[in-house]
C-alpha cells in the first residue's frame, strides 16, 4: 500500500512560475546556485542560497510577499508534467507517509552519502519546508492510468517554459480521493532519485514525492537497443554466479548486489563480477571509456543496450540497459567497492512498448515546496 497524503503546497503562482522553476538543486554546483540566485531573485536557487546563509524562512516569506509563491488553502494532490528535449514525465505529486519507506513497501537501491543527507536536513530546517521531492517509480494499473489521463484533461493551474528550457504544466488533483484509493492497491515502488531526503524519518512524517509510472521512465528515446542473441546464455550465467540474499549489504570485492523485480515484487541477489582484465576497476573503466565493455562482460555479449555516461561527472551516473526477454525482470546493480557509484538498470523487453529503451531519469521538479505549517 502506498499511503498518499494530500498536502497544502506552497507553489509558484502562474505569473511567476517561469522565474521560479529550474532543474533540481543536486544538478547544480554551489557556484551555479549562487550565480542563478543573483540573476533570478525569485527562483528556487535564490531560496536555497538564502537557506545556506541561514535566511531561508525570511526568503520564503519574501517570495510569498512578492506573489512569486502562494500556499494552497486546502490540502490536495497535483499532476505535474515536464517536457524537455523530447522527453516527457507526467506524475502525481503528493505526500507519502514515511513508514512506507521503512516497512519495505518503497525500496531504495542505494544509500545516501552522509554529507548530502546533512545538507538536506539543514536546508529543510532553515526553510521550514521540503524544497524538492523524492522521485518514485511504480507499476501503474489501469485505474491509475485512467485517473491520470482524466486529470490532465482538466484546465491546468499553469503551463510555462522555465528558464532551463523545460515546459512545466501543473494541475490540481480534482480526484484526490480516488487517487488515494487507487494507490492503496499499489504494492511497491522504487526510489529513483532523492535518497538523501529519506534519512532519520519519523513514522508519521509526510515525504514530498513525485510518483512516476515506470512506463514514463522507460520512455521511447533511443534506437540504440542491442537485442540479445542468446538469452539462455544470460540465464545460465546468472544461475551459476548469483545467489539470493535477504537484504543488500557490503559484499566482498569482486561481487555486487542487485535488486531483482519479479512480478513487481523486489528481491535481492548477490553475483560475482568477472575477473581482470574484464573486471577492471570502475574508475579505470570510466576514465578510459571502456565502461561499455565492462558491463557487457558482466551481463554477457549483446545483452546490453549502448550505455550512456559522461566521464568525470561527480554525481551518481545512471547507466541504462534493456534485456529483451527473461523471467528476472528489472535488475538494479550496485557494484562494490564503490570507486564511483554506478547503477545499472535493466528491464525485461516484454514490459516495454516495441522499440523502447531506457533514458536517464533526471526528473526536474524544481517547482515544488512542501511547507510544514
Mark where each language-model region is.
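Surface-exposed, charge/polar-rich loops and edge strands
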Residues: 1-373
Amino acid at each position: 500500500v502506498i499511503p498518499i497524503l494530500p498536502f497544502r503546497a506552497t507553489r509558484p503562482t502562474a505569473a511567476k512560475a517561469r522565474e521560479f522553476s529550474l532543474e533540481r538543486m543536486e544538478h547544480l554546483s554551489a557556484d551555479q546556485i549562487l550565480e542563478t540566485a543573483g540573476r533570478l531573485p525569485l527562483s528556487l536557487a535564490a531560496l536555497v542560497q538564502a537557506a545556506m546563509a541561514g535566511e531561508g524562512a525570511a526568503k520564503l516569506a519574501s517570495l510569498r510577499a512578492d506573489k512569486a509563491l502562494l500556499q494552497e488553502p486546502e490540502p490536495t494532490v497535483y499532476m505535474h508534467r515536464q517536457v524537455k528535449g523530447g522527453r516527457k514525465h507526467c506524475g502525481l505529486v503528493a505526500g507519502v507517509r514515511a513508514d512506507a519507506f521503512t516497512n519495505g513497501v518503497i525500496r531504495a537501491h542505494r544509500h545516501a552519502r552522509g554529507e548530502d543527507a546533512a545538507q538536506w536536513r539543514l536546508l529543510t530546517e532553515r526553510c521550514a519546508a521540503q524544497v524538492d521531492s523524492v522521485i518514485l517509480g511504480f507499476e501503474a494499473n489501469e485505474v491509475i492510468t485512467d485517473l491520470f489521463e482524466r486529470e490532465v484533461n482538466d484546465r491546468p493551474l499553469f503551463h510555462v517554459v522555465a528558464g532551463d528550457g523545460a515546459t512545466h504544466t501543473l494541475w490540481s488533483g480534482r480526484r484526490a480521493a480516488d487517487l488515494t484509493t487507487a494507490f492503496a492497491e499499489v504494492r511497491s515502488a522504487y526510489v529513483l532519485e532523492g535518497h538523501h531526503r529519506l534519512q532519520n524519518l519519523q513514522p508519521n512524517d509526510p515525504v514530498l514525492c513525485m510518483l512516476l509510472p515506470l512506463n514514463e521512465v522507460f520512455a521511447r528515446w533511443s534506437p540504440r537497443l542491442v537485442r540479445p542473441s542468446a538469452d539462455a546464455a544470460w540465464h545460465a550465467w546468472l544461475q551459476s554466479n548469483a545467489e539470493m540474499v535477504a537484504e543488500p549489504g557490503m559484499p566482498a570485492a569482486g561481487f555486487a548486489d542487485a535488486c531483482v523485480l519479479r512480478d513487481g515484487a523486489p528481491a535481492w541477489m548477490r553475483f560475482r563480477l568477472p575477473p581482470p582484465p574484464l573486471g577492471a576497476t570502475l574508475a579505470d573503466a570510466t576514465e578510459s571509456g571502456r565502461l561499455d565493455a565492462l558491463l557487457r562482460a558482466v551481463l554477457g555479449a549483446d545483452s546490453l543496450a549502448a550505455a550512456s555516461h559522461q566521464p568525470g561527472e561527480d554525481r551518481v551516473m545512471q547507466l541504462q540497459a534493456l534485456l529483451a526477454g527473461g523471467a528476472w525482470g528489472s535488475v538494479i546493480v550496485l557494484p562494490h567497492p564503490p570507486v564511483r557509484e554506478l547503477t545499472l538498470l535493466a528491464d525485461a523487453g516484454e514490459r516495454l512498448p516495441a522499440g523502447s529503451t531506457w533514458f536517464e531519469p533526471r526528473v526536474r521538479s524544481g517547482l515544488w515546496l512542501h511547507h510544514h505549517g
